[in-house]
Amino acid sequence: MAKVVDCVLLLAFIAVVRGQEACRTPDHRDGVCHPVQQCPSVRDEFFNSDRVLSEDEIDYLRKLQCKTKDVTICCPDGVTTVDRNPTAVRDGLPNPKAFECGLDTLADRIIGGNYTAIDEFPWYALLEYQSKKGERAFKCGGSLINGRYVLTAAHCLANKKLDEGERLVNVRLGEYNTATDTDCADGNPDDCADPPQNFGIEAQIVHPGYDKNGPYQHHDIALIRLDRDVTMNNFVSPVCLPPDDFPPTSPGLNVTAVGFGHTGRQRHSGIKKKAQFPVFAQEECDKKWKNIEVIGEQLCAGGVFGIDSCSGDSGGPLMVKRFYWIQEGVISFGNQCALEGWPGVYTRVSSYLDWIRQNIRR
């Protein structure tokens, strides 16, 4: 018994010395909070194969999460020296199983149209436009998918205003509050984000099937190649795209949207917000949008009064949590904003993985 006590005390001492927290797993084992990639048993059991995790396994992983500032789980193994270098994520699509994407803080959140935490959804991109008069405004969103590319909607890069002289001039990553120069959590000067990163545009790649003058928003997807590499940190990192064997989210289950879009009073929100709402069955969506011709490369979600993604979020990500965040859709269009019974329509990312891979380069 004395040896057991000594071991527990030693583990706690090591955790304090290394700045890690002691914890207890859901199956009542003592552990230490570490990044997943440093925990061999969890890494090998859940992430070193191509199989799709079950709902029970996903629930277990969620319960393993530590309430720490960084992304950690309760690991019963101790530490290994394997670590991810986030700056190594560059031109290829990041690998979820190598923990190169889809990770943000894991503290408890209340979702439902609320403001995000300062370091939640660090892949969100703001697209800034300049009018012919020189006025600048953020009008679309996007998502960082690797160290050089942002995924967005085609209508954010090809539309009537752009034909008339408006220009996309800037992509901003790592923004939380557009009204402040330095973003701090709850005004705490000791808990602040790194400065946002602004990028010029090297290339704009609109899907060739998108028709900006057509009656439908089919193939509403595009890529932006930034003018330089992104610097990865806790406030800027990529989202995961769906694996090839990704099972779509079933109707009735929730997905999450994020952005700086309109509030209920149609005013643009200066702070990053999130909303959670259910996926719509495809046949029900077809009935609602019978004049639009919703196709298989699109999905529908929302239709809950007061909770939806609005026009200011065009091009932003629609996501599902599979321990890490996977982008399932690109925000395309809707009927007004958060209208009861009317789902928004999103471009289905899994339908365009080959096109995305073919159009990203070094």
UniProtKB/Swiss-Prot annotation:
Q: Where is this site: Cleavage?
A: R109, I110
Task: Output the Gene Ontology cellular-component terms.
Answer: extracellular space
Keyword presence, Protease: yes
Q: What happens when the gene is disrupted?
A: RNAi-mediated knockdown in the susceptible strain G3 infected with P.berghei does not affect the numbers of live oocysts and melanized ookinetes in the midgut; however, severely reduces ookinete melanization in a CTL4 RNAi-mediated knockdown background. Simultaneous RNAi-mediated knockdown of SRPN2 and CLIPB10 in female, partially reduces the formation of abdominal melanotic tumors caused by SRPN2 RNAi-mediated knockdown.
Q: How is it modified after translation?
A: Cleaved by an unknown protease into an active form.
Instruction: Give the enzyme's EC designation.
Output: 3.4.21.-
Its subcellular locations are: Secreted
Key word DNA-binding present in the record?
no
Q: Which SMART domains match?
A: CLIP, Tryp_SPc
Q: Which residues, if any, are the signal sequence?
A: 1-19
Q: Which residues are glycosylated?
A: N114, N254
Could you tell me which residue ranges the Peptidase S1 domain spans? 110-361
Question: Which pairs of positions does the record mark as disulfide bonds?
Answer: C23-C74, C33-C66, C39-C75, C140-C156, C285-C300, C310-C337
User: Where do the catalytic residues lie?
Assistant: H155, D220, S314
The domain-related comment in the record is: The clip domain consists of 35-55 residues which are 'knitted' together usually by 3 conserved disulfide bonds forming a clip-like compact structure.
- Family membership, please give it: Belongs to the peptidase S1 family. CLIP subfamily.
Q: Which PANTHER family match?
A: TRYPTASE-RELATED
The role this protein plays is: Serine protease which preferentially cleaves after arginine residues. Involved in the innate immune response against parasite P.bergei infection by activating the melanization cascade. Probably in the hemolymph, cleaves and activates prophenoloxidase (PPO), which functions in the formation of pigments such as melanin and other polyphenolic compounds. In the susceptible strain G3, appears to be dispensable for ookinete elimination which occurs by lysis.
Protein name as catalogued: CLIP domain-containing serine protease B10
**Native species:** Anopheles gambiae (African malaria mosquito)
